[in-house]
């Protein structure tokens, strides 16, 4: 089987990671003790992608839980599926990273990283054929961002030919618990650009807006945001977890989605949007699902796809529905909105259908877009970064852990280059070959 090793780092990473395992265990018919109580062979056919089979027909998540303080992992352990994880795979420190990227990357995190890599090796060695790694983390704090990116680069060194996939939560002033989030996020993106193959940008700004505007929650909690994240993560991993033809492993997904190696930041979307614990009264039709899925209000990144163009798109429909209708609707969207898809990648929209819907829904659709509009997210963080950096505010916390100001300057310019690259391909047409090779000549768009 083609296995994936899952790593969750930091408070946010552990919380969305724990939710992810709750949701997919439920979908695969696995209870909190790891026993199977399902009703369909489809649930077990590719169970080995995410679970190890242990003695007594127990299924154990191939998950590694990492943090620099014990608190969050204690609450995962005492949570609904806390007992399903392998106890040896909890790796934690005591000091905390204090929302400081440098502590996670260079000091505290660097001390813990080898014990994490031991567990990574152990899990990888017991795999039949490892396809790659997925990391859940946030970019705003210290551990998920600093130590998360340290782990990525160490794993990259040791497993250069395996796919590295991240679910990265982007910070937003609307749900902020730290002033230095733009610093942590910028130096993290600097790492992700170079060291990951696929990054799902899960943007707190967008999650907050969905809860507030669409779900009419006046004071959204992290629990509400994480409900949306787990629905999205379940959706984008459907093709990996259930039998099917399209994007059935991480590498095939990357080949379909990433036309240029640096431009691997995806905008996820989901339909229908529901709040926690709510039941759906009426199943949506395929046209409604398709229309909602492409709507900017359903995007998990606070970017408007209409401000950019799609390089590539993958769509996953779940539930019992007519394949013919799905194909018609997807063509319909492309024909009506052809100006929003780059014309120099023909057939750049791929669709998969999986029979098993998520819990509580008759059918759902998940959207993965590689859109040039994602530059709006990077611009937002870059502006916040620059505002503080030009005054050198809070820098002493980072230089005190041995970081150099140059690192900040480099990260800033790398992010601005990324924005320019997206802009360059947004403006590119099919007939002007040879004018842009690799580098965008303009400084900043």
From Swiss-Prot:
It is found in: Cytoplasm, Cytoskeleton. Mg(2+) binds at residue 69. It comes from the Eukaryota. The modification 5-glutamyl polyglutamate is found at residue 438. The keyword Ribonucleoprotein does not apply. Belongs to the tubulin family. Residues 429-445 have a biased composition (Acidic residues). The MREI motif is common among all beta-tubulin isoforms and may be critical for tubulin autoregulation. The keyword Transmembrane does not apply. One of its GO terms (molecular function) is structural constituent of cytoskeleton. Keywords: Cytoplasm, Cytoskeleton, GTP-binding, Isopeptide bond, Magnesium, Metal-binding, Microtubule, Nucleotide-binding. This is Tubulin beta-1 chain. CDD domains: beta_tubulin (cd02187). Pfam families: Tubulin (PF00091), Tubulin_C (PF03953). PROSITE patterns: TUBULIN, TUBULIN_B_AUTOREG. GO terms for cellular component: cytoplasm; microtubule. Tubulin is the major constituent of microtubules, a cylinder consisting of laterally associated linear protofilaments composed of alpha- and beta-tubulin heterodimers. Microtubules grow by the addition of GTP-tubulin dimers to the microtubule end, where a stabilizing cap forms. Below the cap, tubulin dimers are in GDP-bound state, owing to GTPase activity of alpha-tubulin. Its cofactor is Mg(2+). Some glutamate residues at the C-terminus are polyglycylated, resulting in polyglycine chains on the gamma-carboxyl group. Glycylation is mainly limited to tubulin incorporated into axonemes (cilia and flagella) whereas glutamylation is prevalent in neuronal cells, centrioles, axonemes, and the mitotic spindle. Both modifications can coexist on the same protein on adjacent residues, and lowering polyglycylation levels increases polyglutamylation, and reciprocally. The precise function of polyglycylation is still unclear. Some glutamate residues at the C-terminus are polyglutamylated, resulting in polyglutamate chains on the gamma-carboxyl group. Polyglutamylation plays a key role in microtubule severing by spastin (SPAST). SPAST preferentially recognizes and acts on microtubules decorated with short polyglutamate tails: severing activity by SPAST increases as the number of glutamates per tubulin rises from one to eight, but decreases beyond this glutamylation threshold. A motif (MREI motif) lies at residues 1-4. Residues 424-445 are annotated as: Disordered.
């Amino acid at each position: 089987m083609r296995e994936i090793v899952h790593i969750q780092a930091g408070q946010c990473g552990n919380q969305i990671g724990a939710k992810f395992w709750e949701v997919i265990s439920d979908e695969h018919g696995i209870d909190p003790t790891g026993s199977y109580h399902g009703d369909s062979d489809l649930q077990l056919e590719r169970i080995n992608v995410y679970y190890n089979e242990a003695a007594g027909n127990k299924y154990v998540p191939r998950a590694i839980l990492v943090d620099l303080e014990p608190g969050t992992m204690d609450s995962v352990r005492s949570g609904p599926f806390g007992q399903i994880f392998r106890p040896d795979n909890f790796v934690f420190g005591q000091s905390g990273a204090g929302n400081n990227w440098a502590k996670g990357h260079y000091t505290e995190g660097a001390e813990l990283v080898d014990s994490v890599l031991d567990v990574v090796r152990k899990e990888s060695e017991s795999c039949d054929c490892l396809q790659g790694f997925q990391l859940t983390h946030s970019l705003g704090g210290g551990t998920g961002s600093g130590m998360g990116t340290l782990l990525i680069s160490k794993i990259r060194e040791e497993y250069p030919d395996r796919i590295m996939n991240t679910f990265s939560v982007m910070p937003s002033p609307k749900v902020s618990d730290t002033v230095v989030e733009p610093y942590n996020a910028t130096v993290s993106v600097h790492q992700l650009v170079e060291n990951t193959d696929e990054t799902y940008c899960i943007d707190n700004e967008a999650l907050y807006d969905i809860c507030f505007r669409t779900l009419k929650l006046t004071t959204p909690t992290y629990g509400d945001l994480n409900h949306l994240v787990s629905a999205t993560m379940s959706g984008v991993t459907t093709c990996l977890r259930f039998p099917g033809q399209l994007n059935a492993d991480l590498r095939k997904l990357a080949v379909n989605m990433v036309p240029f190696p640096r431009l691997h930041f995806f905008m996820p979307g989901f339909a229908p949007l529901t709040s926690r614990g709510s039941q759906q009264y009426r199943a949506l039709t395929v046209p409604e699902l398709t229309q909602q899925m492409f709507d900017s209000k359903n995007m998990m990144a606070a970017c408007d796809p209409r401000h950019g163009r799609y390089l590539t798109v993958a769509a996953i429909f779940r539930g019992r529905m007519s394949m013919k209708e799905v194909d018609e609707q997807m063509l319909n969207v492309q024909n009506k909105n052809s100006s929003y898809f780059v014309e120099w990648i023909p057939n750049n929209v791929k669709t998969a259908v999986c029979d098993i819907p998520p819990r509580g829904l008759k059918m759902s659709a998940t959207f993965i877009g590689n859109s040039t509009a994602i530059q709006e997210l990077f611009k937002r963080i870059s502006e916040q970064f620059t505002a503080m950096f030009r005054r050198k505010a809070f820098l002493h916390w980072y230089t005190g852990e041995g970081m150099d100001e140059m690192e900040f300057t480099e990260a800033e310019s790398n992010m601005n280059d990324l924005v320019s690259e997206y802009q360059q391909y947004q403006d590119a047409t099919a007939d002007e070959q040879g004018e842009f090779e690799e580098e965008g000549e303009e400084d900043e768009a």
